[in-house]
Amino acid sequence: MSNIVFMGTPRFAVPILKKINQKYKINCVFTQPPSKSNRGQKFTKSPIHTCAEGLNLEIKTPKKIDEEYEYLKELNLDLVIVVAYGQLISKKILELSKKGFLNIHASLLPKWRGAAPIQRSILNNEKKTGISFMKIDEKLDSGPVCNK
């Protein structure tokens, strides 16, 4: 596979990006735009943004992923790996990848789909949790699960 894009934002996604980057060439990393945080309200880059800079990877931070439709189309995508990216991905973007979009989700789907699955597992005293691999469709965390 030669045309891979990674989409992610939080710290949870950092070791996954690093591991994939060791074995495959990642064409570009998409993450959320820097946001104001802390008392000084300074703009802060996401953990994935900082990691991708350290790995010398190209970075895109669109407010809406559809803004990058033409760019993604030109990449002739083979696979897109998504880890807690924070945006719903439209059908027209999903159709650009030959092998689809693979989501790595921090819960045993279908339980705790959506945002903050780790926190919700803890708050609900789950005895067992894990990670799910699923193909992305147009709905939130509802595509077919490949592995848990």
Model-identified regions with their sequence ranges:
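Donor/substrate-binding cores of folate-linked one-carbon enzymes
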Residues: 79-148
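N-terminal Rossmann-like dinucleotide-binding module
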Residues: 1-40
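Short, structured active-site "lid" loops
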Residues: 47-59, 79-82
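Short amphipathic alpha-helix with an adjacent loop that forms part of the alpha/beta core around
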Residues: 66-76, 95
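N-terminal beta-loop-helix "entrance" segment that forms/cooperates
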Residues: 35-53
